[in-house]
């Protein structure tokens, strides 16, 4: 594209006929005739001053009288030399090739704006994909072996427990039998430092009676509770091998009045297991569970009471050394976009109640769990620091109870525990109850979503 010729620029004699005409009408004069002298430096105007401008200057200088008798200095009208651009700098207007300015083709960066980390739409790999990759990578050569070992321990222990869970037994005795059995069968007593993290109990043994839905365990120094004929008892305990947790629960009742309640909950759990699978929508599974559960009724004292699915509890996925993951499987129809994925491990459990179907926290302590995202730098009490060290070395992110601490020989831990709880370093879990006079039942299994099949790892011939 042609560019406009700058003003005052004279073309060469071979470039234009106009330039030739000017040369004829105004023939060039010698330097002495024109009165033009060279610069003190001896340099001529390299740009070539216009002849007309030189002549005009000469005439003006002659016309003006010299009053002081001295030769007046002629004003220098020469144009300033164009400065050549320094190396690495651009001209104005820009005409220097960038390759001459930026060595090695290293050009300036633009504005760097980091992606918002919690916006999956702006990330190449979404949080869901990262979670899936983490789960799949977790399925190493020992994955199935560890899970099957933990499941077999659970089956053998609960088979014995079902023979002794009869009216008249205390909850403390029943819990001790379960915990002793798990420690014996895994080969890890959990007394030496770090031994409980290799294999053993995955969380406090749950022994919940009647309207107590979940999270109750006998604690040292509390009033003894005895199992009665008209009680509905939920037995929920977990076994882990190298952090692979098997979570399974069942309900026992001796009065046939509650048979329909147990049947409803067992059927609902089996429905959840049937619908579970890779890419299964969790909202669909929840809807199917609720439909089956709430199709049952229980007759108590001549009154037909519909079985209600608990709305404040849910099934959940299981992570290594973490009983509760990020996914939940409610027992009622819910709006969620979550799906089950290959490599997921789920605890499919259901709770059915003759009460309101909602739970609330009750006074008491079920267990404790370390909050790994909270810093402990602000701890001042030596007892709290010592207890925190014990928790990290022996339980990590596993939930534990007072009974587990005392089994290891830990004493005088109450003050330190209060300090850890008040600083949010340790979470405290309370029992969950429905309305008084109601009855709640529970059944639960752990299922592995393997690439080519699902394996209900805790299934036995009992339930």
Swiss-Prot record:
<feature type="binding site">
    <location>
        <position position="236"/>
    </location>
    <ligand>
        <name>a divalent metal cation 1</name>
    </ligand>
</feature>
<dbReference type="GO" id="GO:0046872">
    <property type="term" value="F:metal ion binding"/>
</dbReference>
<feature type="binding site">
    <location>
        <position position="316"/>
    </location>
    <ligand>
        <name>a divalent metal cation 2</name>
    </ligand>
</feature>
<dbReference type="InterPro" id="IPR036005">
    <property type="entry name" value="Creatinase/aminopeptidase-like"/>
</dbReference>
<keyword id="KW-0963">Cytoplasm</keyword>
<dbReference type="InterPro" id="IPR001714">
    <property type="entry name" value="Pept_M24_MAP"/>
</dbReference>
<feature type="compositionally biased region" description="Basic and acidic residues">
    <location>
        <begin position="1"/>
        <end position="12"/>
    </location>
</feature>
<feature type="compositionally biased region" description="Acidic residues">
    <location>
        <begin position="41"/>
        <end position="53"/>
    </location>
</feature>
<feature type="binding site">
    <location>
        <position position="247"/>
    </location>
    <ligand>
        <name>a divalent metal cation 2</name>
    </ligand>
</feature>
<keyword id="KW-0645">Protease</keyword>
<dbReference type="GO" id="GO:0005737">
    <property type="term" value="C:cytoplasm"/>
</dbReference>
<dbReference type="GO" id="GO:0006508">
    <property type="term" value="P:proteolysis"/>
</dbReference>
<feature type="binding site">
    <location>
        <position position="215"/>
    </location>
    <ligand>
        <name>substrate</name>
    </ligand>
</feature>
<feature type="compositionally biased region" description="Basic residues">
    <location>
        <begin position="70"/>
        <end position="85"/>
    </location>
</feature>
<comment type="similarity">
    <text>Belongs to the peptidase M24A family. Methionine aminopeptidase eukaryotic type 2 subfamily.</text>
</comment>
<feature type="binding site">
    <location>
        <position position="444"/>
    </location>
    <ligand>
        <name>a divalent metal cation 2</name>
    </ligand>
</feature>
<feature type="binding site">
    <location>
        <position position="247"/>
    </location>
    <ligand>
        <name>a divalent metal cation 1</name>
    </ligand>
</feature>
<feature type="binding site">
    <location>
        <position position="349"/>
    </location>
    <ligand>
        <name>a divalent metal cation 2</name>
    </ligand>
</feature>
<feature type="binding site">
    <location>
        <position position="444"/>
    </location>
    <ligand>
        <name>a divalent metal cation 1</name>
    </ligand>
</feature>
<dbReference type="Pfam" id="PF00557">
    <property type="entry name" value="Peptidase_M24"/>
</dbReference>
<keyword id="KW-0378">Hydrolase</keyword>
<dbReference type="GO" id="GO:0070006">
    <property type="term" value="F:metalloaminopeptidase activity"/>
</dbReference>
<dbReference type="InterPro" id="IPR002468">
    <property type="entry name" value="Pept_M24A_MAP2"/>
</dbReference>
<protein>
    <recommendedName>
        <fullName>Methionine aminopeptidase 2-1</fullName>
        <ecNumber>3.4.11.18</ecNumber>
    </recommendedName>
</protein>
<keyword id="KW-0031">Aminopeptidase</keyword>
<keyword id="KW-0479">Metal-binding</keyword>
<dbReference type="InterPro" id="IPR000994">
    <property type="entry name" value="Pept_M24"/>
</dbReference>
<dbReference type="InterPro" id="IPR050247">
    <property type="entry name" value="Met_Aminopeptidase_Type2"/>
</dbReference>
<dbReference type="InterPro" id="IPR036390">
    <property type="entry name" value="WH_DNA-bd_sf"/>
</dbReference>
<feature type="region of interest" description="Disordered">
    <location>
        <begin position="1"/>
        <end position="96"/>
    </location>
</feature>
<feature type="compositionally biased region" description="Polar residues">
    <location>
        <begin position="58"/>
        <end position="67"/>
    </location>
</feature>
<dbReference type="GO" id="GO:0004239">
    <property type="term" value="F:initiator methionyl aminopeptidase activity"/>
</dbReference>
<comment type="function">
    <text>Cotranslationally removes the N-terminal methionine from nascent proteins. The N-terminal methionine is often cleaved when the second residue in the primary sequence is small and uncharged (Met-Ala-, Cys, Gly, Pro, Ser, Thr, or Val).</text>
</comment>
<feature type="binding site">
    <location>
        <position position="324"/>
    </location>
    <ligand>
        <name>substrate</name>
    </ligand>
</feature>
<dbReference type="InterPro" id="IPR036388">
    <property type="entry name" value="WH-like_DNA-bd_sf"/>
</dbReference>
């Amino acid at each position: 594209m042609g560019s406009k010729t700058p003003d005052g620029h004279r073309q060469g004699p071979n470039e234009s006929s106009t330039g030739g005409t000017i040369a004829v009408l105004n023939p060039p004069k010698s330097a002495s005739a024109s009165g033009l002298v060279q610069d003190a430096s001896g340099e001529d105007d390299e740009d070539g001053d216009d002849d007309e401008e030189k002549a005009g200057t000469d005439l003006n200088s002659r016309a003006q009288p010299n009053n002081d008798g001295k030769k007046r200095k002629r004003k220098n009208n020469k144009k300033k030399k164009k400065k050549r651009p320094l190396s690495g700098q651009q001209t104005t207007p820009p005409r220097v090739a960038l390759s001459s300015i930026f060595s090695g083709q290293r050009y300036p960066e633009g504005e760097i704006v980091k992606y918002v980390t919690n916006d999956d739409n702006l990330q190449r790999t979404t949080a869901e994909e990262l979670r899936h990759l983490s789960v799949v990578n977790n399925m190493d050569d020992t994955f199935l072996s560890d899970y099957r070992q933990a499941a077999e321990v659970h089956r053998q222990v609960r088979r014995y427990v079902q023979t002794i869970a009869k009216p008249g037994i205390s909850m403390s005795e029943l819990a001790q039998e379960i915990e002793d059995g798990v420690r014996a069968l895994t080969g890890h007593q959990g007394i030496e430092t770090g031994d409980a993290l290799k294999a053993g109990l995955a969380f406090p043994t749950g022994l919940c009676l009647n309207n107590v839905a979940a999270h109750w365990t006998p604690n040292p120094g509390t009033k003894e509770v005895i199992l009665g004929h008209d009680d509905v008892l939920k037995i929920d305990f977990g076994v882990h091998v190298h952090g692979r947790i098997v979570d399974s629960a069942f309900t026992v009742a001796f009065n046939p009045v509650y048979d329909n309640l147990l049947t409803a909950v067992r059927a609902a759990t089996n429905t959840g297991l049937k619908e579970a699978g890779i890419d299964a929508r969790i909202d669909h599974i929840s809807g199917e569970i609720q439909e089956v559960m709430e199709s049952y009724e229980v007759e108590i004292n001549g009154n037909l009471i519909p079985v209600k699915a608990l709305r404040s509890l849910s099934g959940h996925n299981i992570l290594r050394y973490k009983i509760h993951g990020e996914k939940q499987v409610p027992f009622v129809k819910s709006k969620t976009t979550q799906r089950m994925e290959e490599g997921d491990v789920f605890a499919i459990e259901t709770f059915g109640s003759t009460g309101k179907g909602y739970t609330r926290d009750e006074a008491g302590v079920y267990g404790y769990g370390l909050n790994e995202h909270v810093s402990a730098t602000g701890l001042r009490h030596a007892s709290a620091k010592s207890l925190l060290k014990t928790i990290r070395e022996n339980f990590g992110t596993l939930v534990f109870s007072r009974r587990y601490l005392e089994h290891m020989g830990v004493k005088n831990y109450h003050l330190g525990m209060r300090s850890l709880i008040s600083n949010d370093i340790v979470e405290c879990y309370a029992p969950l109850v429905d309305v008084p006079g109601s009855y709640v039942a529970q059944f639960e299994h752990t299922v592995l979503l393997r690439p080519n099949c699902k394996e209900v790892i805790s299934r036995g011939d009992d339930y």
